[in-house]
Structure formats: structure tokens, C-alpha cells
Design a protein with these regions (language model features):
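Active-site entrance/lid segments in N-terminal catalytic domains of soluble metabolic enzymes
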Residues: 1-141, 153-156
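Short, glycine/charged-enriched secondary-structure capping and boundary segments
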Residues: 15-17, 43-46, 140-143, 162-164, ...
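Receiver (REC) domain switch/active-site residues of two-component response regulators
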Residues: 26, 145, 201
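Short beta-strand and adjacent tight-turn residues that come in two discontinuous sequence segments
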Residues: 30, 149, 205
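Glycine-rich, proline-tolerant flexible connector loops at the mouths of alpha/beta enzymes
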Residues: 37, 151-161, 210-214
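Alpha/beta catalytic cores of nucleotide-metabolism and tRNA/nucleoside-modifying enzymes
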Residues: 82, 165-182, 186-238
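Glycine- and Gly-Pro-enriched alpha-helical subdomains that act as flexible
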Residues: 144-146, 151
């Protein structure tokens, strides 16, 4: 599944769909809850950008973690290959996540845009960021095949119901018409089983494998997935 962000540049959007087809992706998930960036105070405090901007603070961090510096300077220059031919901010210019969302993504995206993207893609199509019954019903109306009940990891607003809190109502309303995925807050095997017991067809998450990736690379991700699998199997037996 390819997580899709809807850009202002329609040519870029079309190109990304074409590349997904060439790469034989099974599905596209259109992200609908980040047409602008949330006020991510941690990023503001740390000065986080992608790629990293070298500052006195970051240089000190690199000095204290020499392997970071070795990896950064010994590998290919960071770039977002799908964006580099369209926008300079997509290549190697340091930009914050909030600035990227606000300046690059189409804040006027609506249901018609989502429906057109689904038609162009022509395959399994998910809307990521659905948190209400009314939006879930609309997703069914435009022909989506699945929805992710998600608040983007709680990173967009300072307060929100959790996806799990919304799950039962949404499943009751549309669960017989569309696949419902619980996204966010999934840390343990019991979390997966609780979501499935309410009616979710699947669960997804980010932090549980991204932290492992940052700490130990591919082997870390493999270990995190194995831990989750082991917990689910153990919890089902218990």
C-alpha cells in the first residue's frame, strides 16, 4: 500500500499514481487529515527538518553520536525521488514537516478530488484519516474499498478521540460495505486483538516499527514485527 499525499501540482499527483502502477502496488491510501501541518511543538523546539539542517545543536549531536555522522556523510544524498523533478523543496532543501504540508499540499482537496484519484488509480483505494460515521459513509459513496480510522498518531490536534474510540460506531455504520482499518495506538498484540474484536479488518501503525528502524535499521524492524506476531499468538492462546 502506498500512502498518498495530494499535492497542488496535479501533474505530480498523476505521476505518482503512474509510478505506483509501475511498481505493482496493491493499493493507494489517500491521506485526508494532513492538508496542513499540525503545530508540532517538538519539531519547533528541536528544529527538525528533512533533510536535517546543520546547526550548532545538531553538530553537537552528531559529535556525540559518531555513527550518525558516518552514516549521514557516507551514504547518498537524501532526496525524495518522486518529487525532485517537480518542486525544489522535494529534493535536498531542508524544510520542516509543517512547512511542507502547508506549502506543497492542496488545502482545497475535496471529495471530488478523492473520487477522481480513485478512478485514475483503478484499484484498491483507501482513505486514511476518517474519524466520523458521516465521512465513513461518504467514503463508501465515492467507491473507496477501505478506510483507516486514524487521527494521524495524535500529531495534528492537541486533543482528539482515539481511533479505537470511534471504531465501533464506524464499523456498525459501514463495516458491511467497506474494510475498516484501525490506525494508531497499536503497540501490543492485545491492541490488535481488541480492534479486531470490535470489527476492524486490520490494524496499522507507525511508531512501533519506525522507532525500531531508527534504533537498529532493518533488523530492528524485523524484530519489532516478530515481537508483535509473537504477542498476538500468545495473547490468542491466553
Amino acid at each position: 500500500m502506498f500512502q498518498f499525499y495530494f499535492h497542488k501540482d496535479r501533474g505530480l499527483n498523476d505521476n505518482m499514481v503512474d509510478k505506483c502502477k509501475e511498481a505493482n502496488f496493491d493499493a493507494i491510501a489517500l491521506t485526508v487529515d494532513t492538508i496542513t501541518g499540525g503545530n508540532r511543538e517538538r519539531d519547533l523546539k528541536t528544529g527538525f527538518t528533512s533533510p536535517p539542517r546543520l546547526t550548532l545543536s545538531s553538530l553537537i549531536s552528531f559529535a556525540l553520536h559518531p555513527m550518525w555522522a558516518i552514516n549521514y556523510f557516507s551514504h547518498e544524498k537524501f532526496e525524495l525521488s518522486q518529487l525532485k523533478d517537480y518542486i525544489k523543496q522535494g529534493s535536498n532543501l531542508a524544510i520542516s514537516v509543517g512547512d511542507y504540508f502547508s506549502s506543497m499540499l492542496d488545502q482545497n482537496m475535496d471529495w471530488k478530488d478523492a473520487e477522481k484519484l480513485r478512478a485514475k488509480w483503478g484499484g484498491q483505494f483507501c482513505l486514511k484519516g476518517i474519524m466520523s460515521v458521516s465521512d465513513a459513509k461518504k467514503a463508501v459513496d465515492i467507491g473507496a474499498t477501505s478506510i483507516m480510522v486514524s487521527n494521524h498518531g495524535g500529531r495534528q490536534l492537541d486533543g482528539s478521540r482515539s481511533p479505537f474510540d470511534q471504531l465501533a460506531d464506524i464499523v456498525d455504520a459501514v463495516g458491511d460495505k467497506i474494510d475498516v482499518i484501525c490506525d494508531g495506538g497499536i503497540r501490543r498484540g492485545t491492541h490488535v486483538l481488541k480492534a479486531l474484536s470490535v470489527g476492524a479488518k486490520a490494524c496499522s501503525g507507525g511508531r512501533f516499527y519506525l522507532y525500531a528502524l531508527a534504533a537498529a535499521g532493518q533488523s530492528g524492524v524485523e524484530k519489532a514485527i516478530l515481537n508483535m506476531k509473537t504477542e498476538i499468538e500468545r495473547d490468542m492462546k491466553l
